[in-house]
């Protein structure tokens, strides 16, 4: 017999498990999807039988009319699908063929997040005439110079990751081992952001003064602190863009996408870009592609930096 609130209970159980594993970011996404769908259904106790093909279709239309972007809608739908499939595997939900067939679960590549070379040059090199914005500019510049490193990875770098002139770390999102050579142009910026916090036993000794080193790695308080730091960085990045008179929208993703777009424009193979970003795959072809040496990836990174640094509008 199916529980009347089985879908919600299944979701909450999985969200709780993610939190116990310290996967607070993933748990947060599932929680948002569940909250949104529950609100649409008009109840906090959604049953599996309420998850129908027609209701999902209408829910997707509702999200679109609320102004959500296709990729956000897709994320919600994929979270709901994952929860439903867990219910099916547990024998708590009926198997319904093509249940999510009428809703969007792809990735809209039209939602471009990269800046043009000219805008990127302004963002990273023009004087914002503000110490607060200059610090934001330094963080953005390091993200770009570290092969389009994500803000999450940059903020969570520990001092032990810096091995002479190479950063060695595991990506926060995928746990993929990464190595990035520190270019000479980054050394001064590293010193400016260096964290002087005293290390605390069993707590991360962060490299940069972005997060406090007084919380254990999987503590939910540490996740909340990171979310606060991310919001602050995004807000200040927008302030920086306004101060430099940029018209394009910017966010923490902008530097990562702009690094990849710059490399693609320069003719760098997609396989090299994927590996430099720490992506797990680029379709099935990457399964048999040889890994690129650090030296090769460093040359790509140097080329990207030189291209943007020396870029001049109207050339």
Give the role of each language-model region.
Residues 12-25, 34-111, 126:
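N-terminal core-binding DNA-recognition domain of tyrosine recombinases/integrases
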Residues 99-151, 155:
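Basic, Lys/Arg- and aromatic-enriched nucleic-acid-binding interface segment
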Residues 114, 171-175, 213-215, 277-302:
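Catalytic-site neighborhood detector that most strongly recognizes the C-terminal catalytic loop/helix
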Residues 129, 225, 234-275:
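Short, basic (Lys/Arg/His-rich) helix/loop patches that form interaction surfaces
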Residues 156-192:
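Conserved tyrosine-mediated DNA breakage-rejoining catalytic core shared by Y-recombinases
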Residues 160-166, 246-248, 268-289, 313-315:
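Short, polar N-cap/turn motifs at the start of nucleic acid-interacting alpha helices
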Residues 181-184, 193, 290-315:
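DNA/chromatin major-groove-contacting recognition/catalytic segments
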Residues 183-247:
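Active-site/catalytic core of tyrosine-dependent DNA strand-transfer enzymes
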């Amino acid at each position: 017999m199916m529980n009347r609130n089985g879908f919600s209970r299944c979701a909450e159980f999985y969200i709780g498990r993610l939190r116990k594993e310290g996967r607070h970011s993933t748990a947060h996404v599932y929680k948002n999807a569940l909250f949104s769908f529950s609100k649409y259904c008009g109840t906090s106790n959604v049953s599996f039988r309420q998850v129908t093909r027609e209701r999902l279709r209408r829910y997707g239309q509702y999200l679109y009319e609320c102004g959500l972007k296709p990729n956000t809608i897709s994320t919600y739908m994929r979270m709901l699908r994952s929860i439903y499939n867990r219910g099916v595997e547990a024998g708590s939900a009926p198997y319904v063929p093509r249940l999510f067939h009428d809703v969007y679960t792809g990735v809209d590549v039209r939602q471009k997040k990269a800046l043009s070379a000219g805008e990127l040059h302004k963002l990273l090199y023009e004087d914002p005439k503000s110490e607060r914005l200059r610090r934001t500019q330094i963080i953005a510049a390091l993200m770009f110079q570290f092969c389009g490193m994500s803000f999450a990875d940059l903020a969570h770098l520990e001092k032990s990751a810096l091995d002479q002139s190479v950063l060695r770390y595991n990506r926060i999102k995928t746990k993929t081992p990464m190595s990035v050579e520190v270019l000479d142009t980054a050394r001064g910026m590293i010193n400016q952001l260096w964290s002087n916090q005293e290390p605390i036993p069993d707590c991360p000794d962060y490299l940069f003064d972005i997060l406090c080193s007084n919380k254990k790695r999987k503590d939910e308080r540490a996740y909340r602190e990171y979310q606060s730091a991310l919001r602050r960085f995004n807000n200040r990045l927008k302030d920086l863009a306004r101060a430099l008179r940029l018209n394009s929208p910017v966010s923490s993703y902008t530097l990562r996408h702009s690094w990849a777009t710059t490399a693609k424009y320069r003719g760098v193979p997609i396989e090299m870009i994927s590996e430099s970003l720490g992506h797990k795959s680029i379709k099935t072809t990457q399964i048999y592609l040889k890994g690129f040496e650090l030296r090769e990836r460093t040359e790509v990174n140097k080329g990207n930096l030189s291209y943007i640094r020396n870029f001049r509008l109207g050339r």
